[in-house]
A protein has these predicted regions:
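Membrane-embedded helix-loop-helix hairpins and adjacent transmembrane boundary segments
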Residues: 1-379
Length: 379
């Protein structure tokens, strides 16, 4: 009868402390991701309408918060399905348009001429950073609450089987066409035309008119709507987790039935989280969507891949789960902070996941927790 990932982990490990720590991690990681999406959506709107960035952040805040409060989970799932299909088509269209604009394979020569390291297989720093982003976002798909909530909402086993095939295929196709775009964009975008990587897609669709003025404008709107859809998904997950697993959590199970008062409190948290993320997105120094997304994904990977994925199949212990989540969080935040101050070039996802997995496996072998039951695994 679990309604949130933190709720499930608390039940799975029979620990209220596990539930609360998991809820804190979900809330913090969600805010990081919300900030990144707010910035991305606002930049796209600013590029399309030629409005100040702050005005666009405010517009996104008002629109997405309003329809999240009005529609709830069902509206989020329906809009996500449509926007996901549009994004899949759009990703392929952008990749083909960029390939054509760069004269096919000649685009790699242009990239190499600009900077030989960009096309070098020995540029380990760049390769490590690229793989880190792919890993952080990839493992996030396995354990992120807003993704798992979609499977919670499937109506039967048949729908679950279909989703288990369609979802990985869609991810592979999207990754395959979008990940190379950053490097390919260097051959098309003139030096000094943009200030940060956050502006790559708005520039390609706007100033460069990669898909033409009409189609480019339409797809830019698709990107904005997809970003807004991501915002409402994260808002619902984070708000329900804070309300249910932090504010209302007790040593006994919380009733699965929601009263009107419960709904009102969750809505209040939706507003608070949305406003907080939007305000932080306005801070001048917060200007790297990739960095924030990778940071958020690294936290999920270091903390939840061991305790949620591995914990379904091997011996479980609340102490092990707590130690893993806390250590994983400290490792990711610590390495991320050191890199911001130039003390290391290491990507936080690598030590975070490595330490989290090794610690969980070692402590699981030494703990006296019970083995997972067949019912646990089926859940």
């Amino acid at each position: 009868n679990s309604l949130t990932v933190a709720d499930f982990l608390g039940s799975h490990y029979r620990s209220e402390a596990v539930r609360r720590v998991a809820a804190l991690i979900v809330a913090f990681s969600s805010v990081l991701y919300l900030i990144a999406i707010y910035r991305g959506a606002a930049l796209a709107v600013a590029s399309f309408l030629d409005l100040p960035y702050a005005v666009c952040v405010l517009a996104v805040l008002l629109i997405v918060t309003a329809y999240t409060l009005a529609g709830g989970f069902e509206s989020v799932v329906l809009t996500d399905s449509l926007q996901g299909a549009l994004m899949l088509v759009g990703a392929g269209a952008i990749a083909m348009a960029m390939w054509r604009a760069g004269d096919g394979v000649e685009i790699f020569s242009a990239i190499r001429a600009q900077d030989p390291k960009l096309a070098s297989a020995s540029n380990w720093a760049a390769i490590s950073a690229s793989l880190a982003y792919g890993l952080a976002v990839g493992v996030k798909y396995l354990v992120e609450p807003r993704q798992l909530s979609r499977f919670y909402g499937l109506k039967d086993q048949r729908a679950l089987r279909i989703a288990s095939i369609v979802a990985p295929l869609a991810i592979i196709v999207t990754y395959g066409v979008l990940l190379p775009l950053g490097a390919m964009a260097r051959a098309i975008i003139p030096p000094g035309a943009i200030e940060s990587s956050d502006q790559v897609i708005p520039y390609l669709l706007g100033s460069a008119e990669l898909l033409g003025p009409v189609v480019g404008a339409l797809f830019l709107l698709v990107l904005v709507s997809a970003a807004m859809s991501s915002i409402d998904s994260v808002l619902l997950v984070a708000a329900s987790t804070i309300d249910r697993d932090l504010c209302r959590a007790t040593t006994t199970a919380v009733s699965t039935g929601a009263t009107m008062r419960d709904v009102q409190w969750t809505r209040a948290w939706v507003v608070a989280l949305s406003l907080t993320a939007a305000l932080i997105a306005l801070i001048p120094g917060v200007n790297d969507i990739v960095k924030l997304t990778k940071f958020s994904g690294s936290l999920y990977g270091a903390c939840f891949v061991p305790v949620l994925v591995c914990g379904l199949y091997i011996r479980r212990s609340a102490t092990t789960a707590l130690a893993t989540m806390i250590t994983g969080t400290i490792t990711v935040i610590g390495v991320f902070t050191l890199r911001q101050f130039g003390r290391t070039t290491m990507q936080e996802v690598y030590p975070g996941m490595a330490i989290g997995l090794v610690l969980f496996l070692l402590l699981s072998q030494r703990s006296g927790g019970g083995d997972p039951t067949a019912d646990d695994v089926s859940k």
